[in-house]
From Swiss-Prot:
One Gene Ontology cellular component annotation held by this UniProt entry: cytoplasm
Protein name, entry field: Trigger factor
A GO MF label: peptidyl-prolyl cis-trans isomerase activity
InterPro entries: PPIase_dom_sf, PPIase_FKBP_dom, Trig_fac, Trigger_fac_C, Trigger_fac_C_sf, Trigger_fac_ribosome-bd_bac, Trigger_fac_ribosome-bd_sf, Trigger_fact/SurA_dom_sf
PPIase FKBP-type domain span: 161-246
Annotated family: Belongs to the FKBP-type PPIase family. Tig subfamily.
Domain observations: Consists of 3 domains; the N-terminus binds the ribosome, the middle domain has PPIase activity, while the C-terminus has intrinsic chaperone activity on its own.
Main function: Involved in protein export. Acts as a chaperone by maintaining the newly synthesized protein in an open conformation. Functions as a peptidyl-prolyl cis-trans isomerase.
Record gene name: tig
EC number: 5.2.1.8
NCBIfam families: tig
Keyword Membrane: no
Catalysed reactions, semicolon-separated: [protein]-peptidylproline (omega=180) = [protein]-peptidylproline (omega=0)
Length: 436
């Protein structure tokens, strides 16, 4: 077998492979022999059909099968011999494909980039330090109460924060428009759910009252047919309801799975959850900075095949998340290109750090992470057991732990500065990272 390799770009390889005719004929004859042993042809006993008849009937099919198999097997032999690491399936172009001649074909493919990750000591990390105070717990209790607000009907004019039940009919230039009318809509005034000016115009209205309001759609409104236009809405207020915050009592605590301990028991449970959220937020922000530093300090080219595969995965995830009748391949690839490339870059860099530092998942940390996740459930022991019975889920946790170990490895050499902040600032979501 003859092999030659040409580098057509940084990652693309064009490999020409020649397979001797003798090897081809050996594979063809092997298939014909197998066919002869089981062929059923009228006038001949099974296994007694002359080879000339077998060749006449089956040689073409046997040759095509042999050539297809040889291309697969010789491609694998060639990349092993040439020490190449393809990043995707090759594009195969036959050059000589004739009976009685050596097979020659060209396989074009991308390879994984070869690089070493460096520059750990140049990465700057700001590690947040925070704690959950009593005031933070008080604030969280108020948030939980507001999230469980109930509205009770009142006989007074509507105020900001009240919930009104309304019917409305909207028109532009005297003509009704799609989505401009509804009945029985529940609307909390001041929530910003409707276009600017709509909710403000209903403050002071009473049940049974009808108001005509004329708000203007924003210039950047998602429906371009309505953007910038002034509409006239005839709104009928059916009812007004005032918000009622629930009391901190046993009934309220039970909604969150806390059955005993009263207010102090509930506060302790809330604080425990907040501390878990805080640890995770700080860890995530440190990890993001580490990954940003690794990407910035190790610019690499990535195979288009890997990016395309990641784009397809992101398309599928988007359809699963947002639903609808759209198919994944109907979503423009450009929407996901930057995110996909960044994921591929990070994946290759993290894998290289694991390889260079010879890292393996710390099983004690795997167990610790599973137990921490399980603690959020009512029966944590069952959750832990479930993870250890599901190999796929367990391997996902191991991958997370391995990434954490990569972060720890970088932190040992990076420039780390601790910064004391409030709980609220520590858990605030970070800005989205820039594309690689």
């Amino acid at each position: 077998m003859q092999v030659s390799v040409e580098s057509t770009s940084a990652l693309e390889r064009r490999m020409t492979i020649g397979v001797p005719v003798e090897r081809i004929e050996t594979e063809v004859n092997k298939r014909l022999q197998q066919t002869a042993s089981r062929a059923k042809i009228p006038g001949f006993r099974p296994g007694k059909v002359p080879m000339s008849v077998i060749r006449q009937r089956y040689e073409e099919a046997a040759r095509q099968e042999a050539l297809g198999d040889l291309i697969q097997s010789t491609f694998y032999e060639a990349i092993v011999a040439e020490k190449l690491n393809p990043a995707g399936a090759p594009s195969v172009e036959p050059k000589v494909f004739e009976k009685g001649k050596d097979l020659e074909y060209v396989a074009t493919f991308e390879v994984f980039p070869e690089f070493e990750v460096a520059g750990f000591e140049a990465i700057e990390i700001e590690r947040l330090q925070a704690e959950v105070t009593d005031a933070d717990v008080d604030n969280m209790l108020e948030i939980l109460r507001k999230q469980n607000t109930r509205f009770e009907s009142v006989e007074r004019a509507a105020e900001n924060g009240d919930q009104v039940n309304i019917d409305f009919v909207g028109k532009i230039d005297g003509e009704a428009f799609a989505g401009g009318s509804a009945k029985g809509t529940q609307l909390v005034l001041g929530s910003g759910r409707m276009i600017p000016g709509f909710e403000d115009a209903l403050v002071g209205a009473k049940a049974g009252e009808e108001r005509v309001i004329t708000p203007t759609f924003p210039e950047d409104y998602q429906n371009l047919d309505l953007a910038g236009k002034t509409a006239e809405f005839t709104v009928t207020v059916n009812s007004v309801a005032a918000p009622q915050l629930p009391e901190l009592n046993e009934e309220f605590f039970a909604q969150f799975g806390v059955q005993e301990g009263g207010v102090e028991g509930f506060r302790a449970e809330v604080k425990k959850n907040m501390e878990r959220e805080l640890r995770q937020a700080i860890k995530t922000k440190v990890k993001n900075q580490v990954m940003e530093g690794l990407v910035a300090g190790n610019p690499i080219e990535v195979p288009k095949a890997l990016v395309d595969n990641e784009v397809n995965r992101l398309r599928v995830q988007a359809v699963q998340q947002f639903g609808g009748n759209i198919k994944p391949d109907q979503l423009p690839a450009e929407l996901f290109q930057e995110q996909a490339k960044r994921r591929v870059v990070l994946g290759l860099i993290v894998a290289e750090v694991v390889k260079q530092k010879e890292l393996k998942p710390d099983e004690a940390r795997v167990r610790e992470l599973i137990e921490e996740m399980a603690s959020a459930y009512q029966e944590p022991e069952q959750v832990v057991a479930w993870y250890y019975k599901n190999a796929e889920q367990l391997n996902e946790v191991r991958s997370v732990v391995l990434e954490e170990q990569v972060v720890d490895t970088v932190l040992q050499q990076a420039k780390v500065t601790d910064k004391s902040v409030s709980y609220e600032e520590a858990v605030k979501p970070a800005e989205a990272p820039q594309a690689a």
